Regions:
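A generic structural signal for alpha->beta connector loops
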Residues: 15, 35, 93-95
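Fold-independent oxyanion-binding glycine-rich loops
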Residues: 1, 23-25, 44, 52, ...
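Short, flexible, basic/aromatic active-site loop/helix in glycosyltransferases
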Residues: 31-56
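Short secondary-structure transition/capping segments
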Residues: 4, 32-34, 108-113
Length: 138
């Protein structure tokens, strides 16, 4: 994650109360039925893969968590939560603003994601070494 994404997120949350970085999906996404068949294909234009940072006004996030935990303690059915943005969507009427992140901003969710991370960091290190060498020659 680069500083520019963090700064844009901080500025956005000042205006919007809630924002997450992400990128439009590149892949076709299928929704499956309970038997594993394709039920439909949503329009890719409306789908984003969400990354970090996820930024919220503190009180908004705290109140959203309170509602979630309260509902759970009373045995209410709640969705399977995958990130803080989902908690804000569940626990408030506030819309979460999507801002552009970077396809290089890798979100580590599964063990397989660690391989992507390692590859990215190896490539980054190669570029840093090249830069250091060119600076040393000057």
């Amino acid at each position: 994650m680069d500083n520019e994404i963090i700064v844009r997120s901080m500025h956005t949350v000042e205006k919007e109360k809630a924002c997450v970085a992400g990128m439009p999906v590149k892949d076709t996404i299928k929704v499956s039925d309970e038997l594993g068949y394709s039920a439909n294909t949503p329009d890719r234009k409306s789908l984003w893969q969400i990354q970090t940072p996820q930024c919220f006004e503190y009180d908004l996030l705290a109140q959203s968590y309170d509602k979630l935990f309260s509902d759970m303690s009373y045995g209410k059915s709640v969705p399977a939560i995958t990130d803080d943005a989902m908690i804000v969507e569940y626990g408030s009427d506030t819309k979460v603003k999507l801002i552009e992140g970077s396809y290089e901003n890798i979100k580590v969710t599964t063990p397989e994601d660690m391989g992507d991370c390692r590859t990215f960091f190896k490539e980054t290190q190669k570029n840093v070494k090249k830069l250091e060498i060119s600076v040393d020659i000057l």
